[in-house]
Structures are given as structure tokens and as C-alpha cells.
């Protein structure tokens, strides 16, 4: 779920004003609990937010679901700030209906990392792949994603949207 961020922005001829964190949480509750009603008992969801709205997201998510993890997605697009740190990340909350029974296919999201030598189990390489491009190991993914680029201005999928996500996500 990628809800509107609590930003003061003009986009496509519409103006949006930032509101207090408390009012933003009230807004989230107007629709989020209905989304949760649609989840299967083993269901899970991912919900995006920036640094300014993520506290409200966590609060509202935890009213109905169990947060399993918070993923930090490093994004390079954004404007610098002369009196502050440029925001180069977003949070992605991973939450489930039932923490004892939910679907997560780790095999489909393993990450290919370059390594010098394989890990071995009973003398045989584990999750090891030697190719003409190098030697790799399939490893479990972390909750820090730095390998998915935001669409830059020269990319066909780029839009003017202030919080655009890449198709790869």
C-alpha cells in the first residue's frame, strides 16, 4: 500500500497541505481498517512511508496487524537541503494478520552476492553459483534495500510524482 504521504505539494494542478501527525493517523484509519478486513487470515501487507509520516503508519498498522519488520529502501532521488540532511530513504512496513501463520517465500527474494569462496555443508557448496561473470552466493535478503533505483529523469517510467516507486518494487 502506498498511501498519500503527508506532504505540502502541488501535483497535477491539485494542492495538498501537510497536516499534524495526529490528523494524518485519523485519515489513515478512515480506510486502513477496511483494507485489513479484506486480508486473508494468513495475509500480509507492505506499506510505504517517508520519515515524516512513518510514525503514524506504524501506530495505525499496529492497531490491527503485527509488524514483522521495517524495511529501509535507499532512494537516490530527492533534493538536497542546505540546513538538513537530504532524505534518501523510505520505510516499508511489513505486517501480517497472524505472526504465527503467514506466507513469506524467502526463496523468491534471495539476493545474489559476489563472494570469493562458497559456504559448505557436508563438504559441498551451499547456494553457490560460478559463472563467467564471477562467483556468487544466493543469500537471505536484509531489511535494507539499496539495489532498487528510483526512476531518473531519463528513464521511460519516470513521472513528476513526488513519491514515485520504480516498477521493480
Give residue spans per PLM region:
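Core catalytic lobe of class I
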Residues: 1-169
